[in-house]
Amino acid sequence: AIGIACFAGGTADAANINLNEKTFPDPYVYHYVQEMCEYDTAHSTYYLPEAEKAGVTYFVVTGKTFFRYGLDGGQAVDFSGMQNFSNITSVTLDLRYNIGGRVQGDWNFRADNFFQCFPKVKELVIRSYGGQKVKLTGTSKTLESVDVLLDDEDGSLECTVSAPKVKRVCINGKFAAKSKPLGKCFPNAKRLDITTANIQKVNVTGCKKLEQLQLTDTTQKAIGQINLSKNKKLKSVKITGKLRKTKIVISKKMNKKLVQKLKKTTKKAGAKLIKR
């Protein structure tokens, strides 16, 4: 669904969106937008009135959306042209194709221009199925909240995006080898909720404003070390996994109440708390 159900009622400064293959080069996005357009019989063209365009504030693509236009799975959909909907602040992508509650296939999206196509997005939700790699790359100056859920253990997230305004991140899935530390991607994040099979790839040292951290390791492998020494503003920490003999490094300036809680939980789990 696209957010035209909630029209703003006003007029935008920009002109109407004229539907053509130059503006929307991807055939699946073209057909999707066409369903919202009006037909200009005088010029034999489709267009979306600017008042309706201004009312589009969210964009939701489910698994069935593009498959009804002939997508057979595996392709990377290009969202070029969606930047014309300049008021979109929320984007949800379900990269699965469901029939009768069963996943029948998956699709992906072109990542290198994604944040150019949605230049004002604040909330991003992505759900994927299968062994494909989902990429978050480029730069977003508006993004504030990120949710990525990978249903298949063979899938991975390659996160190299620069999004300095993000405050909340929830990721469930494996990180790809080329992923950057979360502190590079989301340096001002205050809340991180990470569930992954490769917890050693989770580097939060650059998240200096981090207040809430939840780490869950989905394997039964030993966790060597978790470094929280640079996260001096932490107020809440929960770590789940095989913590026996794990070294958890914390700042000497960490909240005293939190330190006491960590001492109890680490002792019970057989982990070691180290202050730096």
List the model feature ranges, each with a label:
Residues 139, 179, 183-184, 203-205, ...:
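Predominantly soluble domains enriched in secretory-pathway, periplasmic, or organellar proteins
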Residues 7-175, 179-187, 193, 247-276:
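N-terminal capping/linker segments that flank leucine-rich repeat
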